[in-house]
């Protein structure tokens, strides 16, 4: 259900600012009389939202004169694109304060004419009109690989200092073969082979970069082929 909710967010954000929502206090949750506005603090480095847009949206939600249900307000703010969690508090003086935790992009996917991020938790997030994150790119067919598999691959790359600096993009071609595009020492591509077993081959690639390329033994090549067990075939 969590994944379905996140997928729903991917498309809902584009119209969020144009839909007024009446927040009633008919269910459980703390109530607060609407004040002059809401203070917003954005948490996390990725600016999917800015304070002004979140404040305007919150003010729109609170524009009625009824008491505000802060729990419902939190749920509504959490539906904004790129928002992982929202918490709303009373400031003790009749106003409200909101903390907004934003997603951190891990990889940008290109599927046919669609492009979006997967975040570091493995959930899809729509692109932001405010900015573009510098993350590795993945081009594949729609539904070619589950998000969980893609998340595991790119999280492994991100957490490795050598690989994360070297790899710019990945292409998943026919037969689920992985082609990597890298720029360590020189621009080149890496034929990683089929999806199964990618971790061992990436560890082999990291060793080659660290012990051969960074040591200056081989710095000019067009392609590295890791499809053969225990080998790195260098092609000019």
PLM features: what roles do these ranges have?
Residues 1-42, 46-236:
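Charged, solvent-exposed interaction patches on well-folded alpha/beta domains
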